[in-house]
Amino acid sequence: YTGVSREYLIRHGLKIDDDDFRQEVLKPQGKGVSRYDGRMTRPLLEPEMDEIKKGLWDDATADRYDTYFYAALTGDLLPRLNVKLDRNYIALTNFYKNWDKDAPHGTTAEQLRNAMTRRPGMRTFFANGWFDLCTEFGYVWHTLDHAGLPKDRVCWKGYKSGHMIYIGEENIHELCADIRSFIQGKDPSK
């Protein structure tokens, strides 16, 4: 079960585009799924814009959290840390509407493999949210299986979260404990 309509699958030769999936899976209910957390939805208010921009211009998770992060960084957090920026902070959400989703994307797997080959003591910990549709765990698994990384020095763990694993009391405590464990030389996935 894919969640998208039979018509969509036939029209696209059984291939499901990531952006299309988020727009199609709850389309019958008039909703789009968040890229950053598949548990969050928003109404498909502007079908034409939703189709053209594939939801990058308006995301349920970004709508919920970006304002707080922006306010914390510009109004409270930076002064407490005694950080003074010589330029204005520009919120990422301002770029969504102009995002070029067709721009070529590279992979960092080769660079990671090279770095780990050159540094025999280097270890890598992948932490992913199960509901993250932005950096999907399937890509991590593919990288782990095909990038030639030294498997004895790579760990992976999934969390009950979206893209921002650190949101939520339970998640942040688990992630912090796992990072501490990793730094101490242990495998947090075990």
Please place each PLM-identified region on the residue numbering.
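C-terminal subdomain of alpha/beta-hydrolase-fold enzymes, centered on the catalytic histidine
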Residues: 1-189
